[in-house]
Amino acid sequence: MKIGIIGAINQETERLKKIIHFYIEKKINTYKIYIGKFKSHDVFLIKSGIGKVSASVATMILIDLYKPDTIINSGSAGSLQSFLKIGDIIIPKKTCYYDVDLTNFGYTRGQIPGYPKEFTVNEKICNFFKKNADKYQLKYIKGLILSGDTFVRENESIKILKKQFPSAIAVEMESSAIAQVCYKFNIPLIIIKSISDESDNNATVNFKENIDFVSYQLSKFVKIILENLIDM
């Protein structure tokens, strides 16, 4: 199986590199790609950079050059719910943009014309972790994760997002863009996130303090996914 993995920043990809065997590094423009193996899987890890456009380009590079059977988006996220704490791992079932608004044309908030109102992720992976939530100490696997080109860092912003998207559990800057490209090319997507901050007035400080730990947590769960992907 060919698996693409997308991480946005150095801390995330450096940890993920450690679980790939015999990798070589390739560079496409400013994008670094690490090509290697995990057991029988061919793995293609790319550092996308931050934000929706960068993530979309990285996803397209993976699809165009390596034609992965599945793509995994691994990264940090800010919590939007009090029951999610720093370090918790979440595997959301769906994602959408919070900074898209064409409601005046009859679309749902967050919906791009020609696309569903929310992008869904690989159902098998959700079912696997639902069955094994206690075993892997997963805090929460259902719900919606939001994406937009802002690092959410204010209490007032949380109130607005929760009002507009009541089912949202977390927010970040890449997953919906990756999901849109995967949807277009019919590539199954797995999203795995770890909470780095609570999206509040302390979010910037908390993110800086926790990103290394969060990246370590993520690498452990990506490894679990790779070990079980065929059975899923």
From Swiss-Prot:
One matching Pfam family, short form?
PNP_UDP_1
Q: Which CDD domains match?
A: MTAN
Which principal EC class is assigned to this enzyme?
hydrolase
The protein's annotated pathway: Amino-acid biosynthesis; L-methionine biosynthesis via salvage pathway; S-methyl-5-thio-alpha-D-ribose 1-phosphate from S-methyl-5'-thioadenosine (hydrolase route): step 1/2
- Cytoplasm: present as a keyword of the record? no
Q: Where is the active site?
A: E12, D197
Binding locations of substrate? G78, V152, M173, E174
Q: Could you list this entry's UniProt keywords, alphabetically sorted.
A: Amino-acid biosynthesis, Hydrolase, Methionine biosynthesis
Listed under catalytic activity are: S-adenosyl-L-homocysteine + H2O = S-(5-deoxy-D-ribos-5-yl)-L-homocysteine + adenine; S-methyl-5'-thioadenosine + H2O = 5-(methylsulfanyl)-D-ribose + adenine; 5'-deoxyadenosine + H2O = 5-deoxy-D-ribose + adenine
Q: Which Gene3D superfamilies match?
A: Nucleoside phosphorylase domain
Q: Which domain of life is it from?
A: Bacteria
Q: Name one GO cellular component term.
A: cytosol
What are the disulfide bonds? none
Any GO molecular function: adenosylhomocysteine nucleosidase activity
User: EC number(s) for this protein?
Assistant: 3.2.2.9
Q: Single Gene Ontology BP term? A: L-methionine salvage from S-adenosylmethionine
Instruction: Relate the assembly described in the record.
Output: Homodimer.
HAMAP family, alphabetized: Salvage_MtnN (MF_01684)
Task: State what this protein does.
Answer: Catalyzes the irreversible cleavage of the glycosidic bond in both 5'-methylthioadenosine (MTA) and S-adenosylhomocysteine (SAH/AdoHcy) to adenine and the corresponding thioribose, 5'-methylthioribose and S-ribosylhomocysteine, respectively. Also cleaves 5'-deoxyadenosine, a toxic by-product of radical S-adenosylmethionine (SAM) enzymes, into 5-deoxyribose and adenine. Thus, is required for in vivo function of the radical SAM enzymes biotin synthase and lipoic acid synthase, that are inhibited by 5'-deoxyadenosine accumulation.
The UniProt entry's sequence similarity note says:
Belongs to the PNP/UDP phosphorylase family. MtnN subfamily.
Name of the featured protein: 5'-methylthioadenosine/S-adenosylhomocysteine nucleosidase
Q: Which organism is it from?
A: Buchnera aphidicola subsp. Acyrthosiphon pisum (strain APS) (Acyrthosiphon pisum symbiotic bacterium)
This protein's encoding gene: mtnN
